[in-house]
Amino acid sequence: MELTPREKDKLLIFTASLLAERRRARGLKLNYPEAVALISAAVMEGARDGKTVAQLMSEGRTVLTRADVMDGIAELIPDIQVEATFPDGTKLVTVHQPIV
C-alpha cells in the first residue's frame, strides 16, 4: 500500500488519538501530544461528517477540559491548526484556546 505523506500524517494523528482516548478512559491525564492528537482527530472526523469550519472551531473547544490534561498543558496549546478534508475540498481549521 502506497500512502502520501499527508495520508501518513492523518494515520499518525488517528493512532495517537486512539491511544489518548484509551488513556483518558482509564482516568489518566493527557500530555501535550495526546491532547493535540485528540482534538485534531475530532476536527478531521467532523469535517469528514460534513460539519462547517465554524462548527468545528467551536466544537474543537469542547473536546477536552483542563481536568482532562496534565498541569500546564492547556497553556502550552494556544491554538491548534488542522488541514481537514471537507466534502468541497481541504480547508484549514484553527481552534483557538482549545482547552478551557
UniProtKB/Swiss-Prot annotation:
GO molecular function: nickel cation binding; urease activity
CDD domains, A to Z: Urease_gamma
Chief place where the protein resides: cytoplasm
EC number: 3.5.1.5
Cellular component GO terms held in the UniProt record: cytoplasm
Catalytic activities: urea + 2 H2O + H(+) = hydrogencarbonate + 2 NH4(+)
Pathway the protein takes part in: Nitrogen metabolism; urea degradation; CO(2) and NH(3) from urea (urease route): step 1/1
Keyword match Cytoplasm: yes
Superkingdom of source: Bacteria
Top EC group: hydrolase
SUPFAM superfamilies per record: Urease, gamma-subunit
GO BP terms: urea catabolic process
Gene3D superfamilies cross-referenced by the UniProt entry: Urease, gamma-like subunit
Signal peptide: none
Subcellular location: Cytoplasm
Key words of the record: Cytoplasm, Hydrolase
Subunit structure: Heterotrimer of UreA (gamma), UreB (beta) and UreC (alpha) subunits. Three heterotrimers associate to form the active enzyme.
Family membership: Belongs to the urease gamma subunit family.
Name of the protein: Urease subunit gamma
